[in-house]
């Protein structure tokens, strides 16, 4: 339902933000 859609959208948004943030920090040395 609507709740599931909101969770999906939020996860997508957070994933994008996290990727942008990690990308700006550079790759961690393993």
UniProtKB/Swiss-Prot annotation:
Tissues/organs with expression: Expressed by the skin glands.
UniProt signal peptide: none
UniProt GO cellular component terms: extracellular region
Gene Ontology biological-process annotations: defense response
Intracellular or extracellular location(s): Secreted
Keyword terms of this UniProt record: Amphibian defense peptide, Antimicrobial, Secreted
Job of this protein: Has antimicrobial activity.
Protein family per UniProt: Belongs to the frog skin active peptide (FSAP) family. Dermaseptin subfamily.
Protein name (database record): Dermaseptin-3.2TR
Lineage: Eukaryota, Metazoa, Chordata, Craniata, Vertebrata
